[in-house]
Regions:
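A structural "domain/chain start" motif
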Residues: 18-65, 89, 124-127, 154-158
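Short, aromatic- and cysteine-enriched interfacial helices/patches
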Residues: 3, 24, 134-135
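Structured catalytic/translocation cores of nucleotide/phosphate-coupled proteins
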Residues: 55, 59, 81-83, 108, ...
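Sec-dependent bacterial lipoprotein signal peptides
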Residues: 1-18
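Solvent-exposed, acidic/flexible segments
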Residues: 48-56, 105-108, 136-147
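C-terminal partner/receptor-binding element of secreted or periplasmic proteins
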Residues: 128-158
Length: 158
């Protein structure tokens, strides 16, 4: 039995070392038809800027469900958004009141616009809120639901 364990250990160490990959890519084209860049135009208020940064991260995560590819400044489409209002509310109050208290509600209001080569092709105002329940809802839920709605607009689901 000890010999079998030694053989398996040797195989376990040597077999992964015998694998590898090599790739050569020659390309003279670029896919710029469905590239998009995200531009945060939120004001200089630090609380709103932090919310804008979190929303941008959530939008980047949601882009994988659309036909767009995230690119830099030379992208064909530019998604510009601005956080107009952000109130995280009180999660503890939402848990305690089971979402009944209006003052504990977390709210996020965003204006977004899609530009194609400098021309606006669509604009939306997205309102997201978390009112509570047993878990109270998290601040990230605000950003995730707003980003999902923006991605739905980009896909043309509305």
């Amino acid at each position: 039995m000890n010999l079998i364990c030694k053989i398996l250990l040797v195989l376990l160490v040597t077999l992964p070392a015998c694998s590898g990959v090599d790739s050569v890519t020659k390309k003279r084209w670029s896919n710029s038809e469905n590239t998009i860049s995200i531009v945060d135009m939120t004001s200089r208020d630090f609380r709103l800027m932090d919310a804008g940064s979190k929303l941008q991260g959530a939008i980047e995560e949601q882009l994988q469900f659309t036909g767009y590819v995230l690119a830099g400044k030379n992208a064909r489409y530019h998604l510009k958004f601005k956080v107009m209002q952000f109130d995280e509310g009180s999660r503890m109050a939402r848990i305690a009141t089971m979402g009944i208290s209006e003052s504990a509600k977390g709210e996020l209001r965003v204006k977004a616009a899609l530009y194609d080569s400098g021309d606006m092709v669509g604009a939306w105002e997205v309102n997201s809120w978390v009112s509570g329940g047993i878990t109270g809802g998290s601040e990230q839920d605000l950003f995730d639901s707003a980003a999902k709605e923006i991605a739905d607009h980009l896909r043309g689901d509305f």
